[in-house]
From Swiss-Prot:
It is found in: Nucleus. Its EC number is 2.3.2.27. It catalyses: S-ubiquitinyl-[E2 ubiquitin-conjugating enzyme]-L-cysteine + [acceptor protein]-L-lysine = [E2 ubiquitin-conjugating enzyme]-L-cysteine + N(6)-ubiquitinyl-[acceptor protein]-L-lysine. The gene is ORTH3. Pfam families: SAD_SRA (PF02182), zf-C3HC4 (PF00097), zf-RING_UBOX (PF13445). This is E3 ubiquitin-protein ligase ORTHRUS 3. Its main location: nucleus. Keywords: Chromatin regulator, Coiled coil, DNA-binding, Metal-binding, Nucleus, Repeat, Transferase, Ubl conjugation pathway, Zinc, Zinc-finger.
Amino acid sequence: MTPATQYPCDPEGVCMRCKSMPPPEESLTCGTCVTPWHVSCLLSPPETLSATLQWLCPDCSGETNPLPVSGVAAGYGSVGSDLVAAIHSIEADETLSAEEKAKKKQQLLSGKGVVDEDDEEEKKKTSKGKKPIDVLSHFECSFCMQSLQKPVSVRVLFALALMLVWFLESTPCGHNACLKCFLKWMGQGHRSCGTCRSVIPESMVTNPRINLSIVSAIRLARVSEKADARTSKVVHYVDNEDRPDKAFTTERAKKTGNANASSGKIFVTIPRDHFGPIPAENDPVRNQGLLVGESWKGRLACRQWGAHFPHVSGIAGQASYGAQSVVLAGGYDDDEDHGEWFLYTGSGGRILKGNKRTNTVQAFDQVFLNFNEALRLSCKLGYPVRVVRSTKDKRSPYAPQGGLLRYDGVYRIEKCWRIVGIQMCRFLFVRCDNEPAPWTSDEHGDRPRPLPNVPELNMATDLFERKESPSWDFDEGEDRWRWMKPPPASKKAVKNVLDPEERKLLREAIKSANPNTMRARLLKEFKCQICQKVMTNPVTTPCAHNFCKACLESKFAGTALVRERGSGGRKLRSQKSVMKCPCCPTDIAEFVQNPQVNREVAEVIEKLKKQEEEENAKSLDEGQCSGTSHEEEDDEQPKKRIKLDTDAEVSATVVESDMK
């Protein structure tokens, strides 16, 4: 016959076994879980009255019902000696960690038995590489058992006797709860932790504090889950080394021709905000630099050699940095081109929305903003501006023919102003290049010349002339134009200057120097506010700040909670010492006497550290394997070098013939 099962009383006081409400003298309360039990329905009730003071219920004492055990445990005999022996064997296994021992014992007692090692290895193989950062499961509310919302670390009271004076100190019990659930629990009149039943101090009841470290960790974990769930955005990017030599179109192009074409390979190694001529050292392909008179069939080809980078805009520049280049395309009727100098109109004032990209009507005034301000800044500082003339300028005798764009050297902006009427920003460009212009037969470049007479300056407004010496000027001693002041430092990086192998090594070095994995970011959120490292034995103060237990204790080492005082041989009343939190003015003197480790936070940190160590060990093994292959290649290098030396003359001849 199967013996009856032991059940406690329900919240209304009715015994769940006999279905009757026992009187108070026949009910017994557990000292751990504070659960009422019916004495008559207990299989082994306490024998004496003194035993009831420290009585533990069957659930807390571990007393089990003599029921038949299912599954694997069923074969261990009626008394359970075999089951106890199996548990002892698990405890004696030194190869298992405490967590693994607990898992095996739980499987054994639940009737599932011990999972075969082969099955565990198979599960590890299938889940390898797909293990998420399971942080949310460690941070669950003690009441609603859901993920924490506005987490509060619960503090409890315990007695502390010092100098024959009793204090009640509050310290975290290591359990967390949602702020809403905690306030609801307190509103029902409870003054104990929902997990360990320890008493909660009145200061926490009236003023609970949110643990910001747990908030940050939960937020990062949720971001990582969303990033894994959603598909990554497809970015169509082609590295400069992989681009063709000419502009190209892809299957994503909506229109034919160069309307939706992509730029070809950039042949010069200059940043996009480079000022002045392009020298030979920035031309690794031809080793001659950008020469005056070079021409191209379109703006995309002009871009590839760095003369003018924008595809559509006629001005390349930044309002806070200056203008690098302009294109003369005859877009305004007032533009005048005299070769060595010209009048240039700024941008703006036209409605170009929708299909009005070719609108030539000025709708409003131009102002010195954006590109116009960039030109004015180059005028103020005397920067050289690269000038490209287009065949679209039908009124200029200096424009190239045959639908080409031609690089005509560098110019300097001497003046800028606005004309009356519909105000337009105007700029006076004067040539200042060391190479002769394409339309002259001179063998030398420009020389300093007087400024031309511009009649419209008599009616100009907002006239601006350079007062200081220009950065790009003529050096009489060297008889050439050069930078008289240091050129402005570039604000944009040069892309793809290194070889592919060098770029790969550089990316790996940057990645190893700046780890930005989600686990590393989570560990960073769990740093101690004193040592600024990942916490060991984390403790949470009453003001919701987190520290290492050792750091906090060493911070107040040697400071007693009570300070004895005396005056003139008389003993005064003892005074309590004030120990302020390292992060705020809150007094944590009682807390420091016996800080309790926040177990939930400690488990998360330990798990993240373990996963990080596994990843580092895996990457180290891969690095050693790749290092071995590199060493083998280094051993073979002398043979390759001898072979290259024998073919040096042949390769040089081939290169020379190709250049011709």
